Amino acid sequence: MTIEKDESTWATFKRLWPHISLYKAGLGVAVVALVINALSDTYMISLLKPLLDEGFGSADSDFLKKMPFIILAMMFIRGLSGFVSGYCMSWVASNVVMRIRRQIFNHFMHMPVSYFDQESTGRLLSRITYDSEQVAAATSKALVNIVRESASIIGLLGLMFWNSWQLSLVLVVIAPVVAFAISNVSKRFRKISKNMQTAMGSLTATSEQMLKGHKVVLSYGGQKVESERFDNISNHMRQQNMKMVVAQGLANPIIQMIASFALVTVLYLASVDSIKETLTPGTFTVVFSAMFGLLRPLKGLTSVTSDFQRGMAACQTLFELMDMDKEKDDGTIEKDTVKGDIKVDNVTFTYPTADGPALRNVSFDLPAGKTIALVGRSGSGKSTIANLFTRFYDVDSGEISLDGDKIEDYRLPNLRKHFALVSQNVHLFNDTVANNIAYASEGKFTRLEIEKAAELAYASDFINKMDDGFDTMIGENGASLSGGQRQRIAIARALLQNAPVLILDEATSALDTESEKAIQSALDELQKDKTVLVIAHRLSTIEDADQILVVDEGEVVERGNHAELIAHDGAYAQLHRIQFGD
C-alpha cells in the first residue's frame, strides 16, 4: 500500500527541481520572457507620471506625440514575451511530465507482485494519468503565473518606493498579513488536493472494474449496484471540487480586502500636509495606480496557489511510489543456459495479506529432464509453488535451488529466462499475433520460427483465417479471440521461447477435448529434454508424469507415479474416481 506522509511544499518542490532543471535552457528563456512581460506592465504605469506632469502640464512638450509609439512598442514586447514564456514553460512541463511518467511506468514494472495484489489497477492508472497531469499544471501554468506575478509585484513595489517611499511604507505593515493569508490558503489547497487525488483514484478504479466486468454486470443485473457505487464516488469527487471552489472563492476577496486597506491608507496619507507637499499629480497617480495594480498579481498568486498545491500534492504521491522498494535482486549468477535440476527443500510461504501459510514445509526434487505434476483441490497451493520458482514471491523459510545454486543467487532477469510459463490466466497485448507469440524477443526469432511455433501449438489454422494473418491486431488482451485461441497463442509463445524449464499451470484448461488432445501432442514434443512442472485438475493430462505430488492445504500429502498412487488408494485415487467415475 502507498505510504502516506506529509512533506512541506518546499521539500517536495526541491525533489521535483532536478527534473525541471534538466531543461534549464527553456526554463531560463521562459523566466526572462516572463520578467520582461511583467516589467512592461510596470513601465506602462510609470508613464503616467511624465504624461501628467509633462505631457499635459507643459505646452511645448512633445511627450504626447511619442506616447502612441511607446504604447505600440510595449504591446508588441508584451505579446511576444507572453508567447515565448508560454511556449517555453509548456515545453519544460511536457518534458518533465513525460520523464516522471516514464520513471513511474518503469518503476511499476520492477515492483514486486505482492504490491499489485494489494492495489487496484484503476488507482495505479490514476497515478500515471491524473496525478502526472497535475504536475504538468504545476510546472507550466502555475510556475508561469508565480514568476510573472512575483516579477510584477517586485516591479510595482520598486516603482512605488522610487516615487514616494513615505506612502509605500504602508505595504510594510500589510505585506505580512497578506503572506499569512496566502500561507493558510496554501495549506487548505494542499489538503483538498490530496483528497481529490484519492477520489480520482477511486473513480478510475470503479470505472475500470465495471468495464472489465461488464458481462457479469449484465448477467446478474448489477447495473443498479454499479450505478449507486459510481454515484457515491462521483459525488465525493464533486464535493472535493466544490471545496476547492469555495477555498478559491473566499481566498481572493479576503486578500483583496486586506490590500484595499492599503489603498485607503494611501489616500488618507496623501491628504496629510507634510506628505502632500512632496507629491505631484503624476507622482500620486503612479503610486496609487501601482498599488491598485498590485491587486491583480495578488489575486493571480492566490488563484494559482491551488494549481501549484495540487501539483505538489500529486508530486508527493508520485515520489512516494518511486520510493517504494523494487523487487529484491541481489543475485550475481548469470548463465546462458541451465540443465533444469530443481530442488525444493522445506519451503514455507505466506502471502502478505494472508493470516496463515499457503505452503508448509514443502520438499521435493525435480531432476533435469523429468516431469512432476501437482494435483489437488483449488486453493491448495499448487500455483503458489510455480510462483516461487520464478521468484514472483520469496519464500519465508527453506530453499529452492536451480542447478545447485539458490534461486536468490541468480539475477532475476537471468533466472526467469530459464522458465517458460503457460498459465490458465492468459494475457495478450494489444499488438499483432506475431508480436504476441514473439513477445519481448526484440527480433531474436524469424517469421518462419514464429509460424512454426504457432503450427506446433495448433494455432495456425485460426490465425491464417484472420484478415491479416499473423499481422492481425488482436485487441486488448485478445478480446477478439476465444479462450481456446488465446491459450494456444500463449502455448506458441512458450514453444518459441524454448526454455529449459517449462511450467504448465492449467495450460489446456480453456480448450475443448479435441483441441486439448491435439495440443497435448505438441506439449509432449515440447517436454522432451526439458524439466517440466505441470499443474492440472484434469488427471488424464498428467498420468505419464514421472512423479505426481498431491497438495492439500499447503502440504504434500502423497507422492508417486500414477500407478503407485492408484494402488495406494489415497487422496489421488479418490480424485481419480471422482473425475472418471470409477
Swiss-Prot record:
Tell me which UniProt keywords the record has, alphabetically.
ATP-binding, Cell inner membrane, Cell membrane, Lipid transport, Membrane, Nucleotide-binding, Translocase, Transmembrane, Transmembrane helix, Transport
What are the ABC transporter domain coordinates in residue numbering?
342-578
Query: Which ranges carry the ABC transmembrane type-1 domain?
Result: 29-310
Gene Ontology CC annotations of this record: plasma membrane
Q: Name one Pfam family in it.
A: ABC_tran
Q: What is its EC number?
A: 7.5.2.6
The residues the record assigns to binding ATP are: G376, R377, S378, G379, S380, G381, K382, S383
The record's SUPFAM superfamilies line, in alphabetical order, gives: ABC transporter transmembrane region (SSF90123), P-loop containing nucleoside triphosphate hydrolases (SSF52540)
Give, as one word, the top-level EC class.
translocase
Write out the catalysed reaction: ATP + H2O + lipid A-core oligosaccharideSide 1 = ADP + phosphate + lipid A-core oligosaccharideSide 2
Q: Name one GO molecular function term.
A: ATP hydrolysis activity
Q: Which family does it belong to?
A: Belongs to the ABC transporter superfamily. Lipid exporter (TC 3.A.1.106) family.
- What subunit structure does UniProt give? Homodimer.
- The identity of this protein, by name, is ATP-dependent lipid A-core flippase
Q: Provide the species name.
A: Aliivibrio fischeri (strain ATCC 700601 / ES114) (Vibrio fischeri)
- The gene coding this protein: msbA
